[in-house]
């Protein structure tokens, strides 16, 4: 997978982004789903690894089926206006919001991969989706590693229905699209793939393409 990564000079841009994130981090963390991970201190791939492994081993009935979903072209597809309006519901300082929005506009459409502040904004933008997913019947466990979503539940039909509702929410509320390569399958017949690993009820293995990098 090829991505265009943008970098900013340490001074003053990098320092300003660091200061903005430091100021808004406590506010964003309060509303963040506990299994929303990636680019968050203490919540890397290992955090999701432990959650999925534990769920599969300890709750066979509640994890009969898995769903793997991705957001299509996530960073470039994020609406700057929708994002800043969502942020304005949590942060009331207009000068702060104007500064953040100026950085968003400098990305040239969507958010820039490589900007420190954009990692936090991208995670925040899906906060409402995380909350919505956990209200859906049939979704017992959910983890999200930035734009990669893994669901576990007891019923295949309910997961299919949840998948359709999630796609509709993405489009109508966030202006995003779900990748067409989504998958729903029984965990007894196929290992769950997430954060570079493949999980079964009894063991976990490193995905082949990740192993070959070493």
Specify the residue positions occupied by each region the protein language model found:
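Short, intrinsically disordered, charge-balanced linker/junction segments flanking boundaries
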Residues: 1, 100-102, 212-214
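Short, glycine/acidic-rich hinge or "gate" loops at secondary-structure transitions
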Residues: 32-41
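C-terminal polymerase-core module
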Residues: 156-214
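A generic secondary-structure signal for well-formed alpha-helical elements
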Residues: 23-31, 87-95, 170-174
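Well-ordered mid-protein domain cores that form the structural environment of catalytic cofactors
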Residues: 17, 21, 25, 41-50, ...
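Conserved polymerase palm-domain catalytic core
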Residues: 50-146, 150-165, 185-191
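Surface-exposed helix-capping loop/turn segments at secondary-structure junctions
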Residues: 30, 135-141, 174-178
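Conserved pre-motif C helix in the palm subdomain of viral-like polymerases
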Residues: 3-32, 108-135
């Amino acid at each position: 997978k090829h991505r265009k990564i943008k970098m900013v000079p340490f001074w003053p841009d990098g320092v300003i982004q660091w200061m903005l994130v430091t100021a808004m981090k406590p506010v964003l963390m309060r509303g963040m789903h506990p299994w929303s991970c990636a680019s968050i201190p203490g919540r890397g791939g290992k955090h999701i690894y432990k959650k999925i492994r534990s769920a599969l081993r300890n709750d066979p009935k509640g994890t009969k089926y898995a769903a793997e979903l991705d957001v299509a072209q996530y960073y470039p597809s994020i609406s700057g206006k929708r994002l800043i309006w969502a942020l304005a519901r949590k942060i009331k300082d207009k000068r702060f919001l104007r500064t953040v929005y100026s950085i968003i506009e400098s990305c040239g459409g969507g958010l820039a991969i490589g900007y420190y502040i954009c990692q936090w904004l991208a995670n925040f933008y899906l906060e409402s989706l995380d909350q919505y997913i956990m209200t859906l019947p049939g979704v017992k466990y959910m983890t999200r590693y930035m734009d990669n979503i893994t669901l576990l539940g007891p019923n295949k039909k309910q997961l299919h229905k949840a998948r359709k509702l999630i796609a509709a929410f993405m489009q109508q509320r966030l202006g995003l699209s779900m990748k067409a390569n989504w998958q729903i399958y029984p965990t007894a017949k196929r290992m769950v793939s997430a954060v570079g690993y493949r999980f079964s009820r009894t063991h976990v293995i490193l995905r082949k393409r990740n192993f070959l990098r070493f």
